[in-house]
């Protein structure tokens, strides 16, 4: 049988099993001596809060943002379609909390931008929408395919 030992002078304030030291931000860029940095610029993010960052429509109600991995938010969007479309474009540069479910090309790709904006407005309040768009190179047509299980 094991003996119980009391240690009155020992205080365990943060056991190793519970305490995890906070990691500092990673270094942005370390170049070996044989590389020469050609550009090193830091720029604040866009501060426009009254227009959707994807479709440029006026935001007349509470905007939606992209959630980052560390719990922050970036961007202002009129719908989940716009939010997810931009998130799918920037996911290699911004650590996202969740994978985007919709991926549309930027509006500059489309000849009839109003058709795309009408689709965004039609599905703005729908939940469970997912899908993508497909570029047909031979006919220069973009097919938008958005679906829902609900």
Swiss-Prot record:
InterPro entries: Poxvirus_VLTF2, Znf_MYM
Example GO molecular function: zinc ion binding
Coiled-coil regions, chain positions: none
Pfam families for the chain: Pox_TAA1, zf-FCS
Domain of life: Viruses
Family: Belongs to the chordopoxvirinae VLTF-2 family.
Oligomeric and partner information: Interacts with itself. Interacts with the late transcription factors VLTF-1.
Function: Acts with RNA polymerase to initiate transcription from late gene promoters.
Name of protein: Viral late gene transcription factor 2
Record organism: Vaccinia virus (strain Ankara) (VACV)
